């Protein structure tokens, strides 16, 4: 039985990684997904190296960690790489999502592929937030305090969930230890979900390019050599640019309050998370009530998910009128993406609360109308 299971796993890996036949006219933007997987693997390797040096001390975690890294060979380089790769991963992730939204205009994507990709996005957001909290600086401490207090507003289980995360009646060393364990374990679960995403993508052939969608013939190529070389070239080209931020301008991704020692008796002058959390943080800031902000954030995430599913199903049943469908969908996507970017910028900056609320309400109505 063990040999059969091992043979089956080896066959699936060999079929999906080496012997996959795909269209020869795949666009170069498909390499963004390969770059995402490449940098996620490098991020996990750097994280495992840093996990050995983590010191679970609520007050002095950041400074002890920095001192350990200075004594450790290439320790600070590994930490700078880990931090810079976080911003890079979220940038590539948003580019990948935008690419998928645009290409759905031309190609139908299987529902299961998009559903697993949505789960990957939720995993990356959770892992990124836990990693943001672990250094326990002034900004991360109050970010964890605000978010855990928001979870406490969930009916019935909110208070129990908040105390379970804290491990006490307040944030302490045990809280950091719990979050550290989750931050180490969740990336390996993420790898399994990514393999599931790849398997569904290759099984349903959702990204087959122009070959099966239009009338002309296109030769199929083996994915093993040509596309791997092309995707690796793109990944190393991105890595070449990131090296500048790792070795020269590594403080570019840091806030100034990322070096402030935590003080539980003094709140931060401003609570401004990393740029990839600004969109989600805007919902919590735009609504005065904590539970309403959390509810709106969850509703919007699932509204975006249902919006794409609606477009996929619409494509399946409207293939006969492809030209009319393409024009109308381009119009919808232009309205949607412009509203998304405007909401991202407006909610990120400290402007009037009333303006943030009305912009949020308008965007929610647009998304619900498109659904």
Swiss-Prot record:
Residues that, per the record, bind heme b b566: 96, 197
GO cellular component, one term: mitochondrial inner membrane
Ranges annotated as spanning the membrane: 32-52, 76-98, 113-133, 179-199, 227-247, 296-316, 329-349, 350-370
Subcellular compartments: Mitochondrion inner membrane
Cofactor: heme b
Gene3D superfamilies reported in the protein's UniProt record: Cytochrome Bc1 Complex, Chain C
InterPro entries: Cyt_b/b6_C, Cyt_b/b6_C_sf, Cyt_b/b6_N, Cytb/b6-like_sf, Cytochrome_b_N_euk/bac, Di-haem_cyt_TM
Keywords linked to the UniProt accession: Electron transport, Heme, Iron, Membrane, Metal-binding, Mitochondrion, Mitochondrion inner membrane, Respiratory chain, Transmembrane, Transmembrane helix, Transport, Ubiquinone
Co-factor: note: Binds 2 heme b groups non-covalently.
Membrane topology: Multi-pass membrane protein
Any GO MF annotation of the entry: ubiquinol-cytochrome-c reductase activity
Residues annotated as binding heme b b562: 82, 183
Binding residues for a ubiquinone: 202
Domain of life: Eukaryota
GO BP annotation list: mitochondrial electron transport, ubiquinol to cytochrome c
Listed PANTHER family: CYTOCHROME B
Function description: Component of the ubiquinol-cytochrome c reductase complex (complex III or cytochrome b-c1 complex) that is part of the mitochondrial respiratory chain. The b-c1 complex mediates electron transfer from ubiquinol to cytochrome c. Contributes to the generation of a proton gradient across the mitochondrial membrane that is then used for ATP synthesis.
Other remarks on this protein: Heme 1 (or BL or b562) is low-potential and absorbs at about 562 nm, and heme 2 (or BH or b566) is high-potential and absorbs at about 566 nm.
Similarity-based family: Belongs to the cytochrome b family.
Quaternary structure, from the entry: The main subunits of complex b-c1 are: cytochrome b, cytochrome c1 and the Rieske protein.
UniProt name for this protein: Cytochrome b
